[in-house]
Amino acid sequence: MASKFRLLLENAEQIVVVCTKEEQYLLEDGMQHLAVLEKSSLVIGNDGCIKAVGPAETIRNHFSNASFENIIDCSGKCILPGFVDAHIHPVWAGDRVHEFAMKLAGATYMDIHQAGGGINYTVEHTTAASVEELFCSFKHRLERMLRAGTTLVECKSGYGLKLETELKMLRVIERAHRELDIAVSSTYCGAHSVPKGKSAQEAADDIINNHLPALKQMSLNGEIHVDNIDVFCEKGVFDLESTGRILQAGKAIGLNLNFHGDELNPMNSAELGAELGAHAVSHLEEVSDKGIAALAKAKCSAVLLPTTAYILRLKQPRARDMLKAGVIVSLGSDFNPNAYCFSMPMVMHLACVNMKMSLKEALAAATINAAYALGRAHTHGSLEVGKQGDVVVINASRWEHVIYQFGGHQELIECVVIKGKIVYKNEKFSICRMDLLK
């Protein structure tokens, strides 16, 4: 009896498989040898996982008696892994478009924050919003990210600060995890800012004594699934001591450490992350040489966010120094009311232009390395047999177009596939429905 499969993508000009030896991440040298197949095809099974990838003729011969739910002719096109966005803040109400003009006039991030804007403004509006309002806007944002090729996102809470609103946000993230196609890595970020009327010490005590026990109980009950814990380690927010206490308490209940550090001021956050065994530290615009060395030794990923440096006019993260030192460099969009970017292709473009990363380095950082930062490199980030069948098909004969083109990706990206199912297709896209490959 002929075997049945979910999807065949055939005759692609290029397939960027990224890795071929089950690597969990790529360092600088490995990035230069990014695995790209020419004139190839890819098969995804009914379980949503990749069954074969290789030369088109080989695949055609091997699967000559197989049937497929869908077949996509990728002649003249390229196939890439679904992009992984390793850092976003997508659940909130009340945009901050008015603050953009303030930044253009010279106000700094902390100027706005200390005046009651920034995170505090969003906390007020998010607290007032209903669960349904938050979910609808959140769903719309994730759908926009998916149309730009993202198939796995890290989603943070952090615009509640008080336990009730933080749990409301985590429930919204959990609903997305259960109902939407895009994969979600959930992050508790109750230490995103110090609530009004509290000191950092008091806020840390509240998180450790009240928030985390509630999270643990809800996780045990199956109400929510939280993967990571985040803290904004910054001058005027949570100092190094408070950050360490919160992270250690989170680690004690099974959460992965993945936090903001060394963004606006040098805080020794990278060193702390390495010491505590963090999966990742984000931002790192102000990281020290010692911090870079510590990240490399600990295999702690540096999640760099070129949109933030661009919008806030900060100095660029030291991507080249990190790569040379052996750091696992990842990328994220930092989507939030302060950095309104849905597109990982644009993030990769900025990483190349402003952080001096190469095209291959940027793609690896937005796929396998970003998956590593989220603890998902075994399922996402490359197109290897056994991994989840998440792919992006672009209408170009060279994969580099997805980074080279600055914007307009709604025309370039023909379709996005998650677990072998076509979850987005542009208006010009067509598929072949065939019972048998002949």
Swiss-Prot record:
Gene3D superfamilies: Metal-dependent hydrolases (3.20.20.140), Urease, subunit C, domain 1 (2.30.40.10)
One MF term in the entry's GO annotations: imidazolonepropionase activity
Requisite cofactors: Zn(2+); Fe(3+)
BP term (GO), one: L-histidine catabolic process to glutamate and formamide
GO cellular component labels: cytoplasm
Pathway(s) of this molecule: Amino-acid degradation; L-histidine degradation into L-glutamate; N-formimidoyl-L-glutamate from L-histidine: step 3/3
Entries under InterPro entries matching the protein: Amidohydro-rel (IPR006680), HutI (IPR005920), Metal-dep_hydrolase_composite (IPR011059), Metal_Hydrolase (IPR032466)
Positions of Fe(3+) binding: 260, 334
Segments traversing the membrane: none
Residues annotated to bind Zn(2+): 260, 334
Catalysis performed (reactions): 4-imidazolone-5-propanoate + H2O = N-formimidoyl-L-glutamate
Pfam families according to UniProt: Amidohydro_1
Cofactor stoichiometry and binding remark: Binds 1 zinc or iron ion per subunit.
Top-level taxon in the UniProt lineage: Eukaryota
Enzyme class (EC, first level): hydrolase
Xref: SUPFAM superfamilies: Composite domain of metallo-dependent hydrolases (SSF51338), Metallo-dependent hydrolases (SSF51556)
Binding site for 4-imidazolone-5-propanoate: 159, 192, 263
Protein EC: 3.5.2.7
CDD domains the record matches: Imidazolone-5PH
Residues holding N-formimidoyl-L-glutamate: 159, 336
Keywords: Histidine metabolism, Hydrolase, Iron, Metal-binding, Zinc
PANTHER family in the cross-refs: IMIDAZOLONEPROPIONASE, IMIDAZOLONEPROPIONASE-RELATED
Family: Belongs to the metallo-dependent hydrolases superfamily. HutI family.
Protein name: Probable imidazolonepropionase
Organism: Xenopus laevis (African clawed frog)
Lineage of source species: Eukaryota, Metazoa, Chordata, Craniata, Vertebrata
